[in-house]
Amino acid sequence: LVKVKELPYENVTTKSHDGLKLSARLYLKDPNAPFDILAHGYKSNSIKDFSGGINLSLENGHNVLLIDQRAHGDSEGHTISFGILERFDILSWINYLNSRFTDKIQISLIGISMGGATVLMASELDLPSNVKLVIADCPFSSATDIITKVTIENNYPIRLLKIFLPVSAKLLGGFDINASSA
């Protein structure tokens, strides 16, 4: 296995639908080959989550876009929405690839944990026809479900969560916590 940090790549950026700078590493083998967009999990990073998976993609002749989800790594943002806003970021990356290369390339969306939920939520959107595959490894079903699970595991009062979660998501994060589910 080749170490991910030793592979040549290009730092690339795009803008999210709400104006944030999103960052990624582009591992380009052949501009006409399929592209895999890899989305990491909550408070993680793509190099850690895909240290083995990137090799599989590259060995199969695919190009890889290793993204930093919003509020992670080099991407801007302060709020993690558990896939609700991040799904639109996936669409921004698809549009980036289609405009830089061509909309004839085949694109796969691959995510782990929150990244898995993100790519599943993105699949609800009106994606271009060149998105051919979505793979979600151990996603959660919804933002509310995962937050409730963590709240219970940490013995926090669940009644307060049900009251404050929707309000704080809207006021602090600008999103509806129930807007989408994987």
State what each model feature region is.
Residues 101-113:
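Alpha/beta-hydrolase fold nucleophile elbow
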Residues 42-56, 69:
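The serine-hydrolase catalytic nucleophile loop
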Residues 33-41:
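Short beta-strand element of the alpha/beta-hydrolase
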Residues 57-76:
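Conserved alpha/beta-hydrolase
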Residues 80-101:
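Alpha/beta-hydrolase active-site loop
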Residues 121-179:
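Hydrolase active-site cap/lid region
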